[in-house]
Design a protein with these regions (language model features):
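N-terminal acidic leader/helix
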Residues: 1-26
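Residues within well-formed alpha-helices
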Residues: 13, 29, 50-51
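Charge-rich, solvent-exposed alpha-helical interaction surfaces
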Residues: 14-17, 33-36, 54
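Low-complexity, intrinsically disordered/propeptide-like segments
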Residues: 24, 28, 32, 59-63
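Amphipathic alpha-helical segments that form the core helices of the histone-fold
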Residues: 27-44
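Short, charged early-sequence alpha-helical segments and their helix-coil boundaries
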Residues: 39-63
Length: 63
């Protein structure tokens, strides 16, 4: 079984993936959103990179 990631690591990895997907994204502006995501089981059950991808996929469908 895989050990769950520490919150700070999950947040850092999610933000890093978001910035990879959108280099214009300010990581500090993304931080409060990602910290909120980290507190929610729906997002936290995903890996941080998968959660970041899901946000961008959702945004692309809406856009």
């Amino acid at each position: 079984m895989v050990e769950p990631l520490d919150d700070a690591i999950w947040v850092a990895r999610c933000i890093a993936r978001m910035v990879e997907l959108d280099p214009a994204l300010d990581p500090e502006l993304a931080r409060p959103v990602v910290e909120d995501m980290c507190s929610r089981t729906r997002w936290r059950d995903m890996g941080p990179e998968a959660a970041a991808q899901a946000v961008f996929d959702l945004d692309m469908r809406r856009g």
